[in-house]
Amino acid sequence: MRPWLLALLLLAAGAAALAAGLSWTVRRRDLVRRPEERRVGFGFRKTLLIYQPSNRGRVNAIAWELARTLARAGHTVTLNVPSPVLTYDPAEYDLLVFGGSAYLGSVGRPLKDYLASLRFRGKQVLLFVVGDLERAPEMAGLRLCVPAGNQVRSIKIRPDEGKKLCQFAQASV
């Protein structure tokens, strides 16, 4: 076989593998998971924390760290993943928190769809995105899902900056 033909075949195989990997990542990002409500803390303020789990579990750990921090600050935190079957009424909560991982410039479709389906006004909303890149185009897409008339604060953190998110949340509430 000629060297240039072999190089061309290897290049095509590599491109196909990359495309398959990206497709797999996007499908995993947009996977609707089974809801499983957890409660953390017994405070006077009520917080709803909905997060899109990440493929590697980093966001799960960050969400739990944030829930424990808010509980220590006097919140009862209801923790769950986004799903069309959730029936939470945002009016019952003092703080609404939504977050997830950034993949290819966007957060998971289930989180955006769930957030866009909610109707609420006059609420304190905290958005967080976990990703490795400094730029945050995914935050703009997530912010567009929040109805007008709410106080929205947002932050993008790296996977190892859970404490930074917790400090941000404490300063925001």
What is each residue range found by the language model?
Residues 2-47, 58-78, 90-173:
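FMN-binding flavodoxin-like domain, especially the glycine-rich phosphate-binding loop
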